[in-house]
From Swiss-Prot:
InterPro entries: PCRF, Pep_chain_release_fac_I, Pep_chain_release_fac_I_sf, Prokaryotic/Mito_RF, RF-1. NCBIfam families: prfA (TIGR00019), PRK00591.1 (NF001859). GO terms for molecular function: translation release factor activity, codon specific. Methylated by PrmC. Methylation increases the termination efficiency of RF1. The lineage of its organism: Bacteria, Pseudomonadati, Pseudomonadota, Alphaproteobacteria, Rhodobacterales. SUPFAM superfamilies: Release factor. This is Peptide chain release factor 1.
Length: 351
């Protein structure tokens, strides 16, 4: 049973926000009030449906004492009682604390791991997979930085994904992705294992954290062409080092000014994510064990091409739909990860 007094508090807060917005809140307050209003609206819809179901059940049970209405009540009561547990579960999920970063754009970083050129090719496959998934969701996918490898893979890629639920959905992708397949360069037909690392960070704004100029060192470098060929090189590439943490970010687009913007954007995202991780660890000693903790060293998934199989090791989910997944159809696996994370957080909240 969900505590009714807590539900009434939420409804009263929602009504207060609605009245403030209707009356014309101060311009400085409108954004914060509108954001809270939008977050509470789906919760209030669930509360309204739940309260209506409880009232309908109470009315039907009262009809049992009326001989003329008893038969009708006996028909309605089982269905009403059967609906309520599902509505309570939906309410519990709606009442879970929201991750403030879920509504933000996502910064996606992909790097090859062990496996040489095959790992670089797989990293490129992952980049295309996420781009197709983003396009299928109607999100904007912007490639911020790309360092290609000699055979058409990538040495490093950074992208920005913007759209409703972008970070909320993509945050489960952080970790080590392992691939098992026969490389195109393998003459003997042997299966090789290689890996790529994915990091998904919530985009941070300048107001989220201040980075003193004394804390960073900016270096300009000569940027190289595709495949490492130093053709048409310029001094536009930028490397920014955050001295307190040792974090280094680079950008090698054609415009040096744009490179500084991109590098600072990625640096802010990494520092913001670092602080989020610190706070999450402080809140819960078990957080590292939960899906979505963002541990970049955790092997989260295996893509087995000969078997057409993808296995997510965090939730023991295996899908024999690898071609569709690599083509960007990630909805089933991400939905399963979301449900698992919600269940873990519910258990933690109710413990």
């Amino acid at each position: 049973m969900v505590p009714m007094d807590r539900l009434l508090q939420i409804v009263r807060r929602f009504e207060f926000l609605e009245a403030r917005l209707s009356a014309g809140a101060a311009p400085a307050e409108i954004a914060a009030l509108s954001r809270e209003y939008a977050e509470l609206k789906p919760v209030v819809v669930e509360i309204s449906a739940y309260r209506t179901a409880l009232e309908d059940l109470a009315e039907a049970e009262a009809m049992l004492s009326d001989p003329e209405m008893r038969a009708l009540a006996e028909d309605e009561i089982p269905a009403l009682r059967a609906r309520i547990p599902g509505m309570e579960q939906a309410l519990r999920l709606a009442l879970l604390p929201k991750d403030a970063a879920d509504a933000r754009p996502a910064i996606l970083e992909i790097r090859p791991g062990t496996g040489g050129e095959e790992a670089a090719l797989f990293a490129g496959d992952l980049l295309r997979m996420y781009q197709r998934y983003a396009e299928g969701q109607g999100w904007r996918f912007e490639l911020l930085d790309l360092a290609p490898s000699e055979l058409g893979g990538i040495r490093e890629a950074t992208a920005r994904v913007e759209g409703e639920g972008a970070f909320a959905r993509l945050k489960y992708e952080s970790g080590v992705h392992r691939v098992q397949r026969v490389p195109e360069t393998e003459a003997q037909g042997r299966i090789h294992t290689s890996a790529a690392t994915v990091a998904v960070l919530p985009e941070a704004e300048e107001v989220d954290l201040e980075i003193p100029a004394a804390d960073i060192r900016i270096d300009t470098m000569r940027s190289s062409g595709a495949g490492g060929q130093h053709v048409n090189t310029t001094d536009s590439a930028v490397r920014i080092t955050h001295l307190p943490t040792g974090i280094i970010v680079t950008s090698s687009e054609k415009s040096q000014h744009r490179n500084r913007e991109i590098a600072m954007q990625v640096l802010r995202a990494r520092l913001y994510d670092l602080e989020r991780q610190r706070l999450a660890d402080a809140r819960s000693a078990d957080r590292k064990a939960q899906v979505g903790s963002g541990d970049r060293s955790e092997r989260i998934r295996t893509y087995n091409f000969p078997q057409g199989r993808m296995t997510d090791h965090r939730i023991n989910l295996t899908l024999y739909a690898l071609p569709q997944i690599m083509a960007g159809d990630l909805s089933e696996v991400i939905s399963a990860l979301t449900a698992h994370d919600q269940a873990a957080r519910l258990a933690e909240m109710e413990a």
